[in-house]
Every structure is written in structure tokens, then in C-alpha cells.
């Protein structure tokens, strides 16, 4: 089989979270994910209680979850209409997880295998 299959390599994973507050199940699913697409309905840390009440996350909570899970990239998404410019709040997430970006309609990525 080695002549046909080549050397083993790590697979790829993408984890998508819809409306959700940070939880152990999401963190477990996101372990080592190449891309985590995660709810960021609220921008500010002081909105964490409100986010929890409605089953959502803040920019910082999603970034912290990505960091704990060892994800490689984080796309924040599902912004509240109160957030008119998600990029303005992005530095807060990037201070926790530097590979965080603001997701947008039509955004695309090609995930590449890491060669052995």
C-alpha cells in the first residue's frame, strides 16, 4: 500500500457554530480545528451576561474558546445589528486569539493539507 497511498498525513477540520454561548461541547468539537466559524453576536466583554441570556457569544468569548481549543483560524460571525462595523471590535478578539478575523458574506478559504 505504501507505493499507492503515500505517507500518512493529518486530516482537515472545519467547525461551524450557529447561535451558541461558549460551551464544553463546542470547545471539544473545535479541538485542533483548521477553521472555527463561531458566533460573535455581542462585541463587548460587559455584554457577556446579555449574550449568555440569549444563547450567544461575545468576540472575546469566541476568541478565548478558539485559543483553548487550539484552533488554527477563527472567523467571527452572526453579528448583532448593534454592531455596525465588526472590524472596529476585532482587535479585542485578536488580543486573545491573533488569527481571528471578521467573517463576511461570500468569504472563502482553501484549507491545505500539511505535508509530512
Feature locations, PLM:
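Metal-dependent phosphodiesterase/nuclease catalytic metal-binding core
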Residues: 1-76, 87-92, 113-116
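Short strand-turn motif at the edge of the Rossmann-like AdoMet-binding core
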Residues: 79-80
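Short, electropositive alpha-helical surface patch
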Residues: 86-107
Amino acid at each position: 500500500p505504501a507505493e499507492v497511498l503515500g505517507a500518512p498525513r493529518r486530516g482537515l477540520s472545519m467547525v461551524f457554530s450557529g447561535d451558541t454561548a461558549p460551551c464544553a461541547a463546542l470547545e471539544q468539537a473545535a479541538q485542533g480545528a483548521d477553521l472555527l466559524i463561531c458566533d460573535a453576536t455581542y462585541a463587548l466583554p460587559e455584554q457577556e451576561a446579555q449574550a449568555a441570556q440569549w444563547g450567544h457569544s461575545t468576540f472575546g468569548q469566541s476568541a478565548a474558546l478558539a485559543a483553548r481549543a487550539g484552533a488554527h483560524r477563527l472567523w467571527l460571525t452572526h453579528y448583532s445589528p448593534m454592531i455596525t462595523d465588526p472590524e472596529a471590535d476585532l482587535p479585542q478578539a485578536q488580543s486573545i486569539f491573533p488569527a481571528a478575523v471578521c467573517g463576511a458574506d461570500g468569504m472563502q478559504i482553501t484549507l491545505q493539507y500539511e505535508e509530512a
